[in-house]
A protein has these predicted regions:
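Hydrophobic, well-ordered secondary-structure elements that form the walls
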Residues: 153, 213, 285
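Juxtamembrane interface helix immediately N-terminal to a transmembrane segment
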Residues: 49, 194-198
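Juxtamembrane boundary at the C-terminal end of a transmembrane helix
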Residues: 281-292
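Outer-pore turret/helix-boundary of cation channels
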Residues: 43, 74, 204-237
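N-terminal leader/targeting and pre-domain segments
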Residues: 1-183
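Pore-loop/selectivity-filter region of tetrameric P-loop cation channels
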Residues: 177-195, 219-280
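Hydrophobic/aromatic-lined pockets within catalytic cores
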Residues: 161, 217-218, 290
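Alpha-helical transmembrane spans of integral membrane proteins, capturing the lipid-embedded, hydrophobic core
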Residues: 199-211, 272-276, 280
Length: 292
């Protein structure tokens, strides 16, 4: 189907499938207020705006109680316009391969939808497609970046990775991909923007735990003072960063003159934890585990 101008389906009612795959529209497509049980715009090309809201015709009959379906797989539109009430109506989306250049407001509306809505709002809208597709999140991230909102772009990429993790863990939480994605997200925020700094929280927790263990259970360490205990704990937690040879040598006590066996084990484990945190951070920022 080829339409040179606008395609207005506003306030339409149709209980059966509306098939318009690979439609070529030179203007806008207006679906506001339309009650369409199943509209197929897969592969469509819209030069202008695709307008969507959550309004439905109350008197429009439906053949079933299932949510309406809007199929936008592999469709391309110039501008995506989604009304604030789009989350209120029962609807399912199909967004795999859906691409858009801009996100904006309805005619006469000057406030950008990107600035006026939270990142979580767009995440909920993307979740109207029960099947996770990274494409829609990547499109939103590009739109945020192009509008100068780089932090928001990082946030939407983070939510995309979170949904990727949820999808992997839904299949089986024992799968390697689920465990790896969980570690990358909880320890290093997937290496995305400011979310990466969550690793500092883990470093702080284990650093303070090691310092407290030295101060409370190792008399030789307590004798050297609290600051020394903090420095020694940090040196053991971050063995790849040389701080002071005296600090690292303190934990090398084969004669057990300073440390008991269980203490040696715990401080050795602290070093392993530090190496694990560093490895997870490196994997996260490298992007090697990001399949999308």
């Amino acid at each position: 189907m080829n339409v040179g101008g606008d395609l207005v389906i506003r306030d339409a009612c149709h209980a059966d499938k509306t098939a318009m795959p690979f439609a070529n529209v030179g203007g806008n497509v207006d679906l506001r207020g339309a009650s369409l049980a199943d509209i197929d715009l897969s592969g469509a090309s819209v030069a202008g705006e695709l307008r969507i809201d959550g309004q439905k015709l109350a008197a429009c009959p439906k053949s079933s109680g299932d949510p309406d379906v809007l199929n936008l797989r592999n469709a391309r539109v110039g501008t995506l316009l989604v009304a604030d009430d789009a989350l209120t109506a029962p609807r399912r989306l199909r967004l795999d391969g859906f691409a858009f250049a801009r996100v904006g407001g309805f005619e006469g509306e000057t406030k950008s939808q990107l600035r006026g809505r939270s990142i979580e709002w767009w995440d909920r809208w993307a979740r109207l497609d029960p099947d996770y597709s990274p494409t829609s999140y990547a499109q939103f991230a590009a739109a945020f970046t192009n509008s100068g909102h780089r932090d928001a772009a990082s946030d939407i990429r983070y939510l995309s990775r979170e949904r990727e993790r949820e999808t992997a863990c839904k299949e089986s939480w024992l799968r390697g991909s689920c465990l790896l994605q969980t570690a990358l997200g909880s320890v290093a925020g997937y290496g995305i923007g400011s979310h990466t700094f969550v690793v500092l929280r883990w470093v702080l927790v284990f650093w303070l735990a090691g310092a407290a263990l030295l101060w409370l259970t190792v008399p030789a360490a307590r004798h050297k003072g609290a600051i020394w205990c903090f420095c020694a704990s940090l040196a053991q937690l971050l063995p790849v960063i040389p701080i002071n040879k005296e600090l690292t040598e303190f934990f090398n006590d084969p004669e057990r003159t300073r440390l008991k066996g269980w203490q040696v084990f715990l401080f050795s484990a602290l070093g392993v934890v530090g190496l694990a945190l560093g490895a997870i951070l490196l994997l996260a920022v490298s992007g090697l585990t990001h399949s999308s």
